[in-house]
Design a protein with these regions (language model features):
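Bacterial lipoprotein signal-peptidase II cleavage site
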Residues: 17-25
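C-terminal motif of bacterial Sec signal peptides marking the signal peptidase cleavage site
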Residues: 13-15
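Short, surface-exposed beta-strand/strand-loop-strand elements in extracellular ectodomains
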Residues: 91-101, 143-145
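Beta-strand cores of secreted/periplasmic/IMS beta-sandwich domains, seen most often
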Residues: 70-93, 118-125, 129
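Extracellular/periplasmic metallocenter environments
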Residues: 19, 38-54, 65-67, 110-147
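Post-signal peptide N-terminal segment of mature Sec-exported envelope proteins
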Residues: 25-45
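Active-site loop-to-helix "anion-binding N-cap" substructures in soluble metabolic enzymes
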Residues: 53-57, 71-74
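Sec-dependent signal peptide recognition
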Residues: 2-9
Length: 147
């Protein structure tokens, strides 16, 4: 219990600290947005297939709840993102282009091409990326990474 209290106090101190030059609310500008998960260290998205036409995602991203066929998702640079894939016959890739095959992969992504496992990624630069089935051209969605 003592270790838990110490950890809780440390988390409060770290969470309340701020970088120099900010607005007094930490490095994340205060916006009173209930979906702002700036203190969350990771995002988990469940990925299944809907036939050969769509990936079905559910979970949360920076904008809140995510659910449906091939939804667009948004993250910030440095977020820890885990796609929990259960999609037999549909190899799951994170790419720089919405392309078939195994080319155009984002570097630094673990477990690319899985049909049953976790694909993890910590985006290092802002931009537009894609989650893609390497076999079916209709199975893809847009990933937006912001600073």
């Amino acid at each position: 219990m003592k270790k838990f209290k110490t950890l809780l106090i440390m988390l409060l101190i770290v969470g309340c600290s701020s970088d120099s030059g900010d607005d007094g609310y930490g490095s994340n500008n205060y916006n009173n947005n209930d979906n702002d998960q700036s203190s969350v260290t990771g995002y988990n998205l469940s990925v299944t297939s809907n036939g050969m036409s769509d990936y079905k995602l559910s979970g949360k991203d920076r904008n809140g709840n995510v659910s449906g066929n091939d939804p667009s998702v948004t993250f910030k640079v440095g977020d820890q993102v885990t796609f929990m894939v259960t999609a037999s016959g549909h190899p799951f890739y994170l790419k720089t282009k919405a392309s078939l095959g195994t080319g155009d992969q984002i570097s630094g992504v673990s477990n690319q091409g899985t049909v049953n496992g976790n694909v993890t990624w910590k985006p290092s630069s802002a931009g537009t990326y894609y989650y893609v089935c390497s076999k079916h051209s209709n199975m893809f969605g847009v990933i937006t990474v912001v600073n």
